C-alpha cells in the first residue's frame, strides 16, 4: 500500500547516523520519518560502550555545537569521563566517556519521541522508490510504500551482513539482528560502486568471574569531572565507575597462533578489509610479532549489568580459542564469557560517488551516512548523519546544501577525505588528519559552528542564548585584558615575583602577562588583591564560567599561532574553494595527461581543493585547471552564495579563540 502521508525526508536506519539525521532534519522543520527494523534498538551501541577519544571527541563536540544529541546523551548516560592528552596542547586534548548502554539508548529514544516533525515506524526497508534519476521514497518488507522528497540511508553493517565465528558464519546485521539482504541487492541494481569491509567485536565477560584484585584500576577524571555537551552538567552524570587493565602474554599469543588455521581472516573466508586502527587480536599478534604483551581495558557496560567489554581483543577466532585466550590473562583465569566475539562483513559504497553534501551523484535526493560510506565508529557516523540530515532537509526545501570546509570543522575534513580520496579500509578520524587542528579544537567547536547551525535552523533558542552569553563574555573580557595595564609602581614586586618569578621592569597589559608560560587567567585576575579581575562576574553558571576562562586563556596564549594559521587559511582559500563546473569535460583541458583527465572525469571533484587531493594529481595539473577556468570565465568561490556559513569565516580571530 501507499502510505497516505508524504514526508519531506525519510531516514532509513536508527543507529548513530540515522538518529542524528532524523533529529537534524526535523529540527529544521522538515517532516521526517525514521524507519527502523526495531524501535527497541534505536541509538544502540553495537560494539564498544564508549564515546569520544582523539579526533572522535572533536566530532562529538561539533555535533553538539550544531544541536545534535550524542554529547547530551553521553552526559546523561556516561559512567566514566576522562580528558585524553590533558598534558598536551589544546589542539589534541579530547574527551572520552564510558557509557551505560541502557541509559544512553534511553536518552536517544527520549529525544526522538519528543522531537516535533519526527515520526517513527518499525519496519525493515527492502527497496527504494526511484523515478528517473531521483529517489522518491522507500518500501518496507511488507510492502508499505512511503513517499518523500529525500531519503537518507544509514544502514550500518546491515547491508548483506555476514557474521563469522571461526569457520562458522551466518547472515546478520549484528548479533541478534537480521541483515538487509534485499536492500543490498536493490542498491547494487542502481550501479553504485560498492565493496566489502569488515569489523569485529570482542567476547563479553561476566564481571562476577573477574578477579579484580589482580588488575590495575583506571578511574575517571574527578577534578573537575568533564562533560561532553556545551550545555551539559556534571550533575547529570549517573554513578561513576572505574575501568580495569590487564595484559596479554606469551601464552595468550601462542593460543591465538595455534588457532589461526581456523580463523576466517587467515583462511580467506573473509574478503572484506578490517579497520587499521582497531585491529583484531589476531592482526595485532601477526602485525606486531615482536611485542610480547598488549594492554587490554576491561570496560563496564553499565550500572545494572555485570557485563564487561574487554577492549583490545576483538576477534573472530573459534569460541574454544576465545575461551582459552581469555583465561590466559591475569585476572581472567576463571572468567565466564557471556557472548562470543565475532567479525562482521558488510557492503559499503564508494564515497567518491557522493557530493560533499553526502548526496549521491547518480541519484538526486538520496543521501548516504555512516558505515555505508566506509567509515568506522559511532562518532564518525553521528557526524555524517547530522550533515546528511541537514542537507536532506535543505534538499526537500529546495535550498542549497551546506558543505563544511576543512578549515571549518573536523566534519569538513571527514567528508572531504571520503569524497576525494575514498577508502581502502574503514576510515577513523584522528587529529592528525586536519591541517588546521589548532583552529579546530574541542573547546571552540561552538564558536566555529553554532552560529552556522542557527542559520541552518538546527540550533534552538536555549543553545543560542547560552552561546551568545559565552561569546560576548569572551570578547569583552579579552578586550579588557588587552587594555588594562600594570606598571612597576602599580604592581607590587612580591606579587609579580609570586606570579612571574621576578618583578616587572616596565608596563605590561594583563594579556601580555597571561601570555607567559605557567600563568593562568585566575592568577592574573588575582593581582593587586583581585583588583585586576573583572568588575562583574563573567557568568553565574560555573560550567559556563569555566568555558569562558578556557577560551580567553587559549585565545591569548596561542594568539600568534592562531593568527598565523588564519593567514594560511586565507592564502589557501582562494584556490581551495574555487568551484569546478558540473559539466566540464577534462579531456578538453589542454595539457592534462590522459591519466589525470580520466581520474577527474571519473571522480568529478566539486572544487579545485578536492581535485588537488585526488591521488595522482600534480601542482602542474592544478595550474592547468586554473588557467582553463580563467580563460573561459568559469568557476566561482564555493560558499560565495546564500549557503549558511558563507559569511561565518573560520579565520575570524574571535571564532578561533
From Swiss-Prot:
SMART domains given in the database record: GIDA_assoc_3
Cofactor: FAD
InterPro entries: FAD/NAD-bd_sf, GIDA_C_N, MnmG, MnmG-rel, MnmG-rel_CS, MnmG_C, MnmG_C_subdom, MnmG_C_subdom_sf
Keyword Iron set for record: no
Primary localization class, coarse: cytoplasm
Quaternary data: Homodimer. Heterotetramer of two MnmE and two MnmG subunits.
Name under which the protein is recorded: tRNA uridine 5-carboxymethylaminomethyl modification enzyme MnmG
Species in which this protein is naturally found: Burkholderia mallei (strain ATCC 23344)
Amino acid at each position: 500500500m501507499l502510505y497516505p502521508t508524504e514526508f519531506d525526508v525519510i531516514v532509513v536506519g536508527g543507529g548513530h547516523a540515522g538518529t542524528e539525521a532524523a533529529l537534524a532534519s526535523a529540527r529544521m522543520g522538515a517532516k521526517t520519518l525514521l524507519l527502523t527494523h526495531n524501535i527497541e534498538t534505536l541509538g544502540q551501541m553495537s560494539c564498544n560502550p564508549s564515546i569520544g577519544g582523539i579526533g572522535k571527541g572533536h566530532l562529538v563536540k561539533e555535533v553538539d555545537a550544531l544541536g545534535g544529541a550524542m554529547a547530551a546523551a553521553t552526559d546523561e548516560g556516561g559512567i566514566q569521563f576522562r580528558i585524553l592528552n590533558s598534558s598536551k596542547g589544546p589542539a589534541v586534548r579530547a574527551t572520552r566517556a564510558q557509557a551505560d548502554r541502557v541509559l544512553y539508548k534511553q536518552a536517544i529514544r527520549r529525544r526522538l519521541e519528543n522531537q516535533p516533525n519526527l515520526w517513527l515506524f518499525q519496519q525493515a526497508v527492502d527497496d527504494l522508490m526511484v523515478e528517473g534519476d531521483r529517489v522518491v521514497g522507500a518500501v518496507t518488507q511488507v510492502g508499505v510504500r512511503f513517499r518523500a522528497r529525500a531519503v537518507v540511508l544509514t544502514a550500518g553493517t546491515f547491508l548483506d551482513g555476514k557474521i563469522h565465528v571461526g569457520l562458522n558464519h551466518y547472515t546478520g546485521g549484528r548479533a541478534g539482528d537480521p541483515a538487509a539482504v534485499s536492500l543490498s541487492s536493490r542498491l547494487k541494481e542502481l550501479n553504485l560502486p560498492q565493496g566489502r569491509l569488515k569489523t569485529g567485536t570482542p567476547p563479553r565477560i561476566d564481571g562476577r568471574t573477574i578477579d579484580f584484585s589482580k588488575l590495575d584500576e583506571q578511574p575517571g577524571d574527578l577534578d573537575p569531572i568533564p562533560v561532553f555537551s556545551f550545555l551539559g552538567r556534571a550533575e547529570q552524570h549517573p554513578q561513576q565507575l572505574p575501568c580495569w587493565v590487564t595484559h596479554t602474554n606469551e601464552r595468550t599469543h601462542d593460543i591465538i597462533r595455534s588457532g589461526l588455521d581456523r580463523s576466517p581472516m587467515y583462511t580467506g573466508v573473509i574478503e572484506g578489509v578490517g579497520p587499521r586502527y582497531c585491529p583484531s587480536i589476531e592482526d595485532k599478534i601477526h602485525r606486531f610479532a615482536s611485542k610480547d604483551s598488549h594492554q587490554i581495558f576491561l570496560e563496564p557496560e553499565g550500572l545494572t549489568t555485570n557485563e564487561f567489554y574487554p577492549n583490545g581483543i576483538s576477534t573472530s577466532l573459534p569460541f574454544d580459542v576465545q575461551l582459552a585466550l581469555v583465561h590466559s590473562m591475569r585476572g581472567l583465569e576463571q572468567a565466564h564469557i557471556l557472548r562470543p566475539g565475532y567479525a562482521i562483513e558488510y557492503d559499503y559504497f564508494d564515497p567518491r560517488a557522493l557530493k560533499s553534501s553526502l548526496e549521491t551523484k547518480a541519484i538526486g535526493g538520496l543521501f548516504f551516512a555512516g558505515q555505508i560510506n566506509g567509515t568506522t565508529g559511532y562518532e564518525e557516523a553521528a557526524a555524517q548523519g547530522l550533515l546528511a540530515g541537514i542537507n536532506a532537509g535543505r534538499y526537500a526545501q529546495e535550498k542549497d546544501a551546506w558543505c563544511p570546509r576543512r578549515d571549518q570543522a573536523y566534519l569538513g575534513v571527514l567528508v572531504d577525505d571520503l569524497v576525494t580520496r575514498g577508502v581502502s579500509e574503514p576510515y577513523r578520524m584522528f587529529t592528525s588528519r586536519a591541517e588546521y587542528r589548532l583552529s579546530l579544537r574541542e573547546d571552540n567547536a561552538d564558536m566555529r559552528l553554532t552560529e552556522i547551525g542557527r542559520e541552518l535552523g538546527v540550533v534552538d533558542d536555549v543553545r543560542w542564548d547560552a552561546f551568545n552569553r559565552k561569546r560576548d563574555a569572551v570578547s569583552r573580557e579579552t578586550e579588557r585584558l588587552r587594555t588594562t595595564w600594570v606598571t612597576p609602581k602599580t604592581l607590587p614586586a612580591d606579587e609579580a615575583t609570586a606570579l612571574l618569578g621576578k618583578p616587572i621592569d616596565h608596563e605590561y597589559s594583563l594579556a601580555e602577562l597571561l601570555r607567559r608560560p605557567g600563568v593562568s587567567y585566575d592568577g592574573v585576575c588575582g593581582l593587586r588583591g583581585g583588583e585586576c579581575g573583572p568588575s562583574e562576574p563573567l557568568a553565574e553558571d560555573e560550567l559556563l564560567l569555566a568555558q569562558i576562562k578556557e577560551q580567553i586563556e587559549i585565545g591569548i596564549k596561542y594568539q600568534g599561532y592562531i593568527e598565523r594559521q588564519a593567514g594560511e587559511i586565507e592564502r589557501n582559500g582562494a584556490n581551495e574553494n574555487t568551484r569546478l563546473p558540473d559539466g566540464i569535460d577534462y579531456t578538453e583541458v589542454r595539457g592534462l595527461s590522459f591519466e589525470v583527465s580520466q581520474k577527474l572525469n571519473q571522480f568529478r571533484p566539486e572544487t579545485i581543493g578536492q581535485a588537488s587531493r585526488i591521488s595522482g594529481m600534480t601542482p602542474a595539473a592544478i595550474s592547468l585547471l586554473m588557467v582553463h577556468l580563467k580563460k573561459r570565465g568559469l568557476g566561482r568561490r564555493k560558499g560565495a552564495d546564500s549557503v549558511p556559513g558563507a559569511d561565518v569565516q573560520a579565520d575570524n580571530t574571535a571564532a578561533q579563540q
